[in-house]
Amino acid sequence: MGKKLVMAQRRGETRALCLGVAMVVGAVITYYILGTTVLPLYQKSVWTQESTCHLIETNIRDQEELEGKRVPQYPCLWVNVSSVGRWAVLYHTEDTRDQNHQCSYIPSSLDNYQVARADVEKVRARFHENQDFFCFSTTRENETSVLYRRLYGPQSLLFSLFWPTFLLTGGLLIIVMVKINQSLSILAAQR
């Protein structure tokens, strides 16, 4: 019976070690992928200065064309704010600024014009309710645009790194526990 117990224990230890090593390898692969995709975007982001913006005006433009999409026209919200003592155009995210310089907010549903228009009206009403809000600006002197929300900020970087770190820590803990168990088994067998 003792030999069967030792064999079962070895099989279980081998499986646990394989699980721990697989978790560590998975975490390393995930770190590599995040290091080549998310980290460069975070490092390139110039929108680091948090400031308070005050709403000057909002305008809905109906005849906008989005490059690369099959949508002929869609409503777009254009927002002017004052930030850090200067006039600026507010953009929802970095991607909004890259998609169309004329739009502060591009609705998510572009298939139905009425739904998109209602979405833009809702966002416009929120801006009029809260005329002072936090925004992100750059330290460049001649920049006339600010962001409402950063896509590639420290929070998104930490959120992206949470699960791989959890996976790496769990895998290392499993490996350490198996090795401690093996060394304690050897010590017990020697007595």
From Swiss-Prot:
Biological processes, Gene Ontology terms: detection of calcium ion
**Keyword flag Transmembrane helix:** yes
Q: Which GO terms describe its molecular function?
A: calcium-activated potassium channel activity; potassium channel regulator activity
Modification after translation (UniProt): N-glycosylated.
Q: Which UniProt keywords apply?
A: Glycoprotein, Ion channel, Ion transport, Membrane, Transmembrane, Transmembrane helix, Transport
Q: What GO cellular component term, any one, is given?
A: voltage-gated potassium channel complex
Topology in membrane: Multi-pass membrane protein
Q: Which ranges of this chain reside in the Cytoplasmic compartment per its record?
A: 2-18, 179-191
Recorded superkingdom:
Eukaryota
Which residues carry attached sugars according to the database record? Answer: N80, N142
Subunit structure of this chain's protein:
Interacts with KCNMA1 tetramer. There are probably 4 molecules of KCMNB1 per KCNMA1 tetramer.
Among PANTHER family, the record links this protein to:
CALCIUM-ACTIVATED POTASSIUM CHANNEL SUBUNIT BETA (PTHR10258), CALCIUM-ACTIVATED POTASSIUM CHANNEL SUBUNIT BETA-1 (PTHR10258:SF1)
Q: Which family does it belong to?
A: Belongs to the KCNMB (TC 8.A.14.1) family. KCNMB1 subfamily.
Q: What does this protein do?
A: Regulatory subunit of the calcium activated potassium KCNMA1 (maxiK) channel. Modulates the calcium sensitivity and gating kinetics of KCNMA1, thereby contributing to KCNMA1 channel diversity. Increases the apparent Ca(2+)/voltage sensitivity of the KCNMA1 channel. It also modifies KCNMA1 channel kinetics and alters its pharmacological properties. It slows down the activation and the deactivation kinetics of the channel. Acts as a negative regulator of smooth muscle contraction by enhancing the calcium sensitivity to KCNMA1.
Name of this protein = Calcium-activated potassium channel subunit beta-1
Organism of origin: Bos taurus (Bovine)
